[in-house]
């Protein structure tokens, strides 16, 4: 095994921030090795359940199923009128657009979603997604998901509500928990846009509560979550340049748009 970059011989387990494993097989020339590996965030038992997803398929069969699944996802959009290189560019970009947010939940023995929370360290029911920053993705990616992949985006919206319940804030950049980077309160745009386009989450009261909470609070340790400078913005309508808060103009513009999104949701 590997502990923070250091190989530990004859050790089969590690408890550390950065762990790894090295596995070797004694083979003869031309011999093929097929190994099955399962990962988990919850327990060894969950890893065994995750392994069942592979069934008895070999690598080639899994590859073919993966190609079929991606063709179904990418095939929701058909383009015409261009050349082969343009088609390749379009679908390559669409593929990359759909890699994130990343699923951060697993299925329990009853087939129900369950997740390890990066926010409070508990194993809880429901969806969870990570590895996305709304400062970038609220502009184009999530509007695309609303239109073309609404069922998947509904799971993402439920996951956002779980994040609020587990941490007290909607995420602005999840990786896997709250990450301190970028500006804005653009979870408001992501949540309001989805709801107004017909992706109705069950707990809309909690959704709205969380949005309002984010307009007048900032995370105690991750200042990019919530609204840094909300005291000035809520009183003056802008974040001044001389209050030792960076990106003043950008924050003001983002917060104003975020407020408009919350207003549209409130009217609904």
Show which residues each predicted segment covers.
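Alpha-helical support elements that line or immediately flank enzyme active sites
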Residues: 92-106, 130-153, 192-197, 260-268
């Amino acid at each position: 095994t590997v502990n923070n970059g250091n190989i530990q011989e004859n050790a089969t387990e590690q408890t550390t921030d950065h762990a790894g494993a090295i596995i070797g097989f004694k083979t003869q020339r031309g011999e093929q090795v097929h190994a099955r590996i399962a990962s988990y965030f919850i327990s060894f038992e969950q890893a065994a359940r995750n392994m069942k997803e592979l069934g008895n398929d070999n690598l080639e069969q899994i590859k073919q199923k993966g190609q079929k699944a991606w063709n179904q996802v990418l095939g929701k959009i058909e383009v015409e009128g261009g050349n082969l290189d343009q088609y390749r560019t379009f679908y390559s970009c669409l593929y990359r657009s759909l890699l994130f947010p990343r699923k951060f939940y697993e299925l329990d023995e009853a087939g129900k979603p369950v997740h390890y929370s990066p926010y409070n360290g508990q194993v809880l029911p429901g969806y969870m997604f990570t590895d996305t920053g709304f400062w970038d993705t609220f502009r184009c990616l999530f509007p695309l998901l609303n239109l073309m992949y609404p069922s998947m985006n509904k799971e993402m919206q439920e996951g956002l509500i779980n994040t609020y319940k587990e941490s007290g804030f909607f995420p602005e950049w999840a990786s896997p928990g709250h990450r301190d980077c970028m500006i804005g309160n653009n979870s408001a745009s992501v949540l309001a846009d989805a709801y107004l386009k017909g992706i109705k989450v069950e707990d809309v009261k909690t959704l709205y509560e969380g949005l309002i909470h984010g307009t007048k609070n900032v995370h105690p340790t991750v200042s990019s979550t919530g609204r840094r400078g909300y005291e000035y913005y809520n009183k003056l309508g802008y974040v001044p340049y001389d209050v030792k808060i960076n990106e003043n103009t950008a924050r003001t513009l983002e917060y104003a748009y975020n407020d408009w999104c919350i207003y549209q949701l409130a009217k609904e």
